[in-house]
Amino acid sequence: GLLAQSSDNNSLRFKVAKAIKTKTAPVIDGILEPLIWKKAPIIDQFVQTEPVELGKASEQTISQILYDDKHIYVAITCRDSEPEKIKRVLSRRDSYENGFGSNSDWVRVGFDSKNNDQSATLFGVNAAGVKIDVAVEGHQNYDVSWNSVWDVAVSSDSKGWYAEYKIPFSIFQFDNKPDMEWGLLIG
């Protein structure tokens, strides 16, 4: 199976998330089909970064990871006690200044497929469905001009909003071993 570790340099560093191989790929529509996603372990030990670094999250976030021979699938549930206040900003793809940051509710998943703490690929989406993808080298070099073909869809209801990702393995550089360990960031 695919195993991921958090990429944080503190006590969160060695939290483990396990991805489960699936025979049935989810339909990427932002609606998390229970029959597909129930197989994937729940990742729910998230903390906030603002206003209190590593403080208890003010709203519940849940993530799950599946994979098949060609893709990684990630589901993220963002609970919101005031769903009418979810910020949905339309912008151009990769426009962090306009569609992300504090302007919009958004999530990202990042993979360090070499598990070397030196490179990663980040995939983000805001609550309006606008995408951002970034290649990271080192700790300061973020290349927003890097673009790849991947799919994500969002939906919302009275409990919050949801993101459902489909990312091809062909994007990543990795050694194809039975028990891979990748670095992982979900936020």
Please report, for each region that a protein language model flagged, where it lies by residue.
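Structural preference for beta-rich elements and adjacent junctions enriched in aromatics
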Residues: 3-187
